[in-house]
Amino acid sequence: MEVSELPLDARLIAVLKERGVGRLFPPQVEAVRAGIFDGRSVLLCTATASGKSLLAEVAAVKAGLEGRMALYAVPLKALAYEKLVHFSYYRGLVKVGVSTGDFDSDDRRLHEFDVVVVTYEKLDSLLRHRPNWLGLVGVVVVDEIHYLGDPRRGPVLESIVAKLRHLGLKTQFIGLSATVGNAGEVAAWLGARLVESSWRPVPLREGVYHGGVIRFSDGSMQRVNAPGDAEVALAVDAVAGGGQALVFTNSRSSTVRLAKAVAKAMEAAGLVPRGAKALAEEVLKASSSKIIGRELADLVARGVAFHNAGLELEVRRLVEDGFRRGLLKVVVSTTTLAAGVNLPARRVVVADYERFDPALGREEIPVLEYRQMAGRAGRPGLDPYGEAVLVARSKGEAEYLMERYVRGQVEGVRSHILAEPNLRAHVLGAVGGGYAKSLDDLVDFFSNTLGAAQMKTSLKLSILRSKIGGVVEELVEWGFLERDGDFVYATELGRQVARLYLDPEVAAGYIRLIKSLRAGNVPAYLYVVLTAPDFPRVRRGRADKRVVEGILAALDVEEDEEFEDLARTASMLMAWIEEVDEDVIYEKFDVAPGDLRVYVDLFQWLGNAAAKLARLVGREEHGKRLEVVTARVVYGVREELLGLVTSLRGVGRVRARTLYNFGYRTLEDIARATVREIASLPGFGEKLAESVIEQARQMLAEGLRGEV
């Protein structure tokens, strides 16, 4: 089928042709015949690089051109910004926006956009706020819909579908995934037509490596002559053959170790590419850690990189872009980042099929996850084939890996929404958002979830009612709901908890701790916010004595193992807001720049939520001070610098401290300065000095005077 045959606006067809899209792939033709451009709901379960995302983008833009809105939901912030770049092709046709944060907002200005890219959680949060523009939504796309089986994100997706059904919106639903074991069941639940295909633009060969040989599933064998450990040999062999390699391993330390080993082997084999030095300089400049930045930049200059959650988003993007441009020949990534790494390579090497889970110990990765990694093999237009290779340590393990992963069936997604913690949050969300006013309403609401669809029993409704009733009683006990017979109402506190997108149990814990505070101090406020299980616990380093004393002076808490972990984590953040050098923090507490960013982002949400809860329960002073502590965590500064970092673009914690120490402490001080004076300060150049002075003068002209 030719693109010109599609039932699309001529302008949209012209953009597709400009992108080099002339003929559709077979799975795309199936999707068109299933009605993806006729408003039909469709579940696309087709191989990586088969063009499903392109169709979803076009359907979203088509809706915009027809005067309707489209929401494009993705599981990760990183994917949201990547998708925004994809939509830039259509910027002459539609306005595209992105919304990933601030759950306590209805984002009423989003109606100004034709297409909005959102994270799952942000979309669910928007549906709880029920902004007026929801009636304009004509298309909802859910990328990576296999996340329905994720214990945390799956219930969010189910809740989104239940809310859309309750609102009665005539919305076209488009689900995308390369890997859903029970696609028919999911499509039936969604009321969508299923398009399922294993067709790929580049043939995929899957096999297992052991003893210097790759044994492929079709019975063929390939000897690998490159020296070194299995993972290194497989990567270097791919590069020697003119390809690129993507290696997945199970820990951050392994990504660094293997990347160094690959770089050394590539040097020995004379395979170091040219042209990556400029990229290495960009990596060094973008990294907030001089130590990690230098370590990574040294590898990048030799055509290799590690890629893990410890790296900042900007650094990860530089690595990904360098790989796509061919400047990097090998990237070694953690298996946990496989979903967010959209990097095709001739050879994908799965070095570890087990990983460590703090709660479960060592566990095997699911077949679904292996398929996600294997799907990256083969660059359309560049590679004649793609290879996905698992590494075995013994002959017996090689046979096991072949049966379990290469020949194995992808697991079906199973719902987790009826598990008590998830049910609790989504019951409150349904009542607080106005989707249910009685137990009967709640039963109806949750009857629309995949969890209900997967309950194969005639007692389904009575089981649902019993589960929901128990959760309602708990929410009443915490003061979030009130019950009058069968009727259920959200209290003002409950509505706010739902709007803040808080786990009710976390909110109840925050309220209890805030009410019990004997005195307010920074360590105690850090401790309160960090009690949410969303925060990873810092396991290394020693808790600051002053932090421990501050917590114990304000709260009656037991000094157990959990307390020690929380006190250590609070100590790490205390060092951050006391402006300790970042590399010192990373080394002392064994955290990385990407970890710190996670803490900061979470604290911005949960710290502000705790401040609002404090005010709602009559603890105004604690609310004010929690807001200040949260702002300090967001910017990593002492309190006296908050005005500077919040007022001036281009001025972070280091430059703000420089300004302050050199006597530029107010907007007036900066506005009176000359460009030469500011430009002479460490970390400032002429261009930034001009910008900072202009910003200060403009703010003063608008009436923002005094201490900042």
Swiss-Prot record:
InterPro entries referenced in this protein's UniProt entry, alphabetically: DEAD/DEAH_box_helicase_dom, Hel308-like_dom4, Hel308_SKI2-like, Helicase_ATP-bd, Helicase_C-like, Helicase_Hel308, Hlx-hairpin-Hlx_DNA-bd_motif, P-loop_NTPase
Coiled-coil region(s): none
Q: Which Pfam families match?
A: DEAD, Helicase_C, Helicase_dom4_arc, HHH_5
Q: Read off the CDD domains from this record.
A: DEXHc_archSki2, SF2_C_Ski2
Q: Where is the Helicase C-terminal domain?
A: 231-429
Catalyses which reaction?
Couples ATP hydrolysis with the unwinding of duplex DNA by translocating in the 3'-5' direction; ATP + H2O = ADP + phosphate + H(+)
Subunit structure and binding partners: Monomer.
Its family?
Belongs to the helicase family. Hel308 subfamily.
Describe the function of this protein: DNA-dependent ATPase and 3'-5' DNA helicase that may be involved in repair of stalled replication forks.
Q: What is this protein called?
A: ATP-dependent DNA helicase Hel308
Protein's organism: Pyrobaculum calidifontis (strain DSM 21063 / JCM 11548 / VA1)
Q: Upper taxonomic classification of the species?
A: Archaea, Thermoproteota, Thermoprotei, Thermoproteales, Thermoproteaceae
